[in-house]
Amino acid sequence: MSSSQVVRDSAKKLVNLLEKYPKDRIHHLVSFRDVQIARFRRVAGLPNVDDKGKSIKEKKPSLDEIKSIINRTSGPLGLNKEMLTKIQNKMVDEKFTEESINEQIRALSTIMNNKFRNYYDIGDKLYKPAGNPQYYQRLINAVDGKKKESLFTAMRTVLFGK
């Protein structure tokens, strides 16, 4: 089996593992999971899909197309040569090996298995400090959207710290 085929197979394993990775509870502009899936789907030779499983046709040019445009032309869109060289130097050229992808698979699986959370267990002394034992629970409830504070309880928390 050629090395590129081995890299593709490893990237497919990584994409499958990333698809099992839970979505962020707090929605950001860019999700780690989504960015990594799109990145390694390209390496694995798989088509990009949206949340519903439909294939996405890429409207944007790929990184290789941009590089070829820059290499073929002396000054596209009125850019001077200095600017082009700066752009070329900043572009990331990812060359994956089987070993590097397997390292990523190992790292992601340890994160998903909560290996270090279990290894470095934090006791109740940190989660429920003596001065304000409900502090972290109140934050977690606010993030999850379970229990909202009223204006009175919010003012009490600000004034008295509890």
From Swiss-Prot:
Anything else known: Present with 2130 molecules/cell in log phase SD medium.
Protein name: Cytochrome B pre-mRNA-processing protein 6
Role description: This protein is involved in processing of the 5' terminus and the intervening sequences of cytochrome b pre-mRNA.
The encoding gene: CBP6
Taxonomy, superkingdom: Eukaryota
Cellular compartment(s): Mitochondrion
Keyword presence, Mitochondrion: yes
GO biological process, one term: mitochondrial respiratory chain complex III assembly
Residues modified to N-acetylserine: 2
Residues with the Phosphothreonine modification: 97
Cited PANTHER family: CYTOCHROME B PRE-MRNA-PROCESSING PROTEIN 6
A molecular function GO annotation: ribosome binding
UniProt KW Mitochondrion keyword: yes
GO cellular component, as recorded: Cbp3p-Cbp6 complex; mitochondrial matrix; mitochondrial ribosome; mitochondrion
Keywords per UniProt: Acetylation, Mitochondrion, mRNA processing, Phosphoprotein
Chief localization: mitochondrion
